[in-house]
């Protein structure tokens, strides 16, 4: 199915509960395909791997208004490049990473938008800080002037019943954080992927990350 049809299907499905941001999860998607996605109106692209993302940014540098999000695991030695080349980093999970991003962002015009990744499902295969660590990490980030904390991100459990509980807990955590004066301007709850984005929207997600449902199954060889 062409990308235009896939996108139209998604837009129809979310019409009653549109998110603030439809993030195209573009891991292993070619720059030329992203150029086509841009022509269809998509502006936010989420990348998992630094070098792959940098290559695409170079190939698409003629396009105005593209917003690059990093959504993968963060390696300490990559923080400087992430801070310089991305508009958002959505997988901050500990103070050290936040501090390194802050230091590397110094001198740039705008602060780096960041989300705290929360290990809400308890699965070892997924990154993120423990839910009980979120308030302390959020406070630490709020003190770093070159970062702007926008909210929380999570990947929920793949089983529907557990996913529902995870979505609910994430919404509760987000709204509780938002009630504190220092975090009153938080505006982003990023959760929901191709398999569960409608369920996520029912639980107040403001950003959904869609890959397979837009681009089909991908492998690294697709590039």
Model-derived regions: residue spans:
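Gly/Pro- and small hydrophobic-enriched strand-loop and loop-to-helix capping segments
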Residues: 205-223
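Conserved alpha/beta-domain cores
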Residues: 1-195, 201-203, 215-217
């Amino acid at each position: 199915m062409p990308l235009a049809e896939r996108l139209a299907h998604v837009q129809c499905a979310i019409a009653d509960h549109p998110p603030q941001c439809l993030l195209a999860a573009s891991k292993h998607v070619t720059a030329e395909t992203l150029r086509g996605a841009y022509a269809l109106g998509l502006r936010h692209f989420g990348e998992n791997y630094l070098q792959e993302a940098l290559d695409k940014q170079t190939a698409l540098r003629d396009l105005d208004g593209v917003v690059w999000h990093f959504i993968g695991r963060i390696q300490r030695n990559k923080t400087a490049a992430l801070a310089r080349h991305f508009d958002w980093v959505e997988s901050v999970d500990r103070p050290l990473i936040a501090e390194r991003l802050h230091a590397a962002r110094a001198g740039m015009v705008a602060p780096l938008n960041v989300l705290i990744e929360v290990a809400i499902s308890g699965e070892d295969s997924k990154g993120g800080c423990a839910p009980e660590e979120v308030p302390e990490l959020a406070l630490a980030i709020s003190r770093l002037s070159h970062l702007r904390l926008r909210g929380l991100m999570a990947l929920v459990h793949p089983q529907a019943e557990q996913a529902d509980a995870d979505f609910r807990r994430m919404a509760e955590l987000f709204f509780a954080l938002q009630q504190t004066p220092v975090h009153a301007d938080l505006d982003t709850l990023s959760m929901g992927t191709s398999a569960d984005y409608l369920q996520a929207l029912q639980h107040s997600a403001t950003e959904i990350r869609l890959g397979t449902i837009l681009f089909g199954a991908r492998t690294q060889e697709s590039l």
